[in-house]
Regions:
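Core catalytic alpha/beta fold that binds nucleotide/phospho-ligands
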Residues: 1-194
């Protein structure tokens, strides 16, 4: 597994909206990532032909065993890649939740996740925990290929064991204070990656 992080604001053209800058940066990041793996060497600036699963997860038809996933939030774009296992990544900038953390959790989280939030010592800890749980769940659903349609409330997060739905997750160092970054990879807990 390898993670690539870019501040897309640094390449954003005057007047260009955020999504356009992100869309322009994604293939560049993917080409950089592909060049880091030996089985892509010698491709000489290969065009990156991407397709999507019916659920919308991107993949490379020419290298179906190579897995990758993007996430963006705030000023950053993150790419997670794995040459062997399905992978999902989520980045979130900590921002106030308009509807309220508990209200959002009641709508979208498993009851066990909601209980964790209710036990937070104060509003600041509750907000950080909300985004930790959110990124774990979103990374998991992206890893499984379901996306948010898979339901954030389907299974609880086990923070102590760093797993969700039988898969491990890794909370990574974010690109900047005030962000949360999580990766989930599809190898079983009993057999960690090589």
């Amino acid at each position: 597994m390898k993670i690539y992080i870019e501040n897309y604001k640094q390449i954003q053209k005057p007047g260009e909206n955020n999504k356009s800058a992100i869309h322009r940066l994604q293939p560049l990041m993917l080409k950089t990532a592909l060049a880091d793996f030996p089985f892509f060497s010698g491709s000489n600036g290969f065009p990156v032909l991407q397709e999507r699963t019916p659920a919308g997860k991107p993949y490379l038809p020419s290298h179906p065993a190579f897995h990758y996933n993007f996430s963006d939030s705030g000023d950053y774009l993150v790419l997670a890649v794995s040459p062997k296992h399905e992978i999902g990544v989520d980045l979130q900038k900590l921002t106030p939740v308009r509807a309220g953390v508990i209200s959002m959790a009641e709508r979208f989280f498993h009851p066990e996740d909601l209980a964790l939030l209710r036990n937070a010592k104060d509003a600041e800890e509750q907000l950080k925990l909300f985004f930790r749980i959110w990124t774990i769940k979103e990374a998991y659903l992206k890893c499984t290929g379901e996306g948010l349609s898979g339901g954030l409330n389907r299974c609880p997060v086990c923070l102590a064991a760093s797993q969700i739905g039988g898969l491990p997750f890794l909370e990574m160092a974010p690109p900047k204070t005030g962000y949360v970054l999580t990766v989930c990879e599809s190898f079983p807990i009993s057999s960690p990656p090589l």
